[in-house]
Design a protein with these regions (language model features):
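Non-transmembrane, aqueous-exposed alpha-helical and coiled segments at domain scale
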Residues: 1-108, 112-175
């Protein structure tokens, strides 16, 4: 009999838009682990402006609680990550995702905002979805109608290489 792996929910929140994010979250839910996303990355010098990466546990009700947090609908996303994956490993992956190539041009990617996902999700090819999700199984964000949206890792797509080249046509409009 196969055992089902536990999912951990990882919240990435833009602390420029929500400076008191950690206190707002800890008042509503338990934080298992908190990581400053820019710490140890090429953007280490911007730690005071860094998004936070928070493991908010393995219970799916955190998705509903998240929807009730003020301003989090526009300034955060939640990744679903198999508990076999280490938080620091995931952090390194997300740090790499901050700098991508679009049409051979280096770009800073704010993948941790709903605006990014609202603009791109329906137009992403499977390879870009796999690149953007990396080891995560899914991502959740809030659309403009305040409904939670979810994008799952595409079936039958292998793990992307570490060359973060985004090729969906939507990105060509950005460069």
């Amino acid at each position: 009999m196969s055992q089902r792996n536990t999912i951990n929910y990882w919240l990435v929140v833009d602390t420029i838009r929500i400076p008191d994010a950690i206190s707002v979250i800890t008042n509503k839910m338990k934080v298992e682990q908190a990581i400053v996303l820019f710490a140890g990355s090429d953007f280490d010098y911007l730690q005071d402006k860094s998004p936070l990466l928070l493991n908010i546990g393995s219970h799916s009700e955190v998705l509903e609680k998240w929807l009730t947090l003020p301003n989090f609908d526009s300034s955060s996303v939640i990744f679903e990550l198999d508990s076999r994956h280490d938080g620091f490993e995931f952090t390194e992956y997300l740090q790499s995702l901050l700098q991508v190539k679009i049409d051979n041009k280096a770009c800073f990617l704010r993948f941790y905002t709903n605006a990014f996902w609202n603009q791109t999700a329906s137009q992403l090819n499977d390879i870009d979805i796999a690149t953007l999700l990396g080891p995560a199984q899914a991502i959740h964000w809030v659309d403009t109608a305040h409904h939670r949206q979810t994008l799952h890792y595409p079936p039958q797509v292998s793990e992307p290489s570490q060359a973060f080249n985004l090729t969906s046509p939507i990105f060509k409009l950005w460069v």
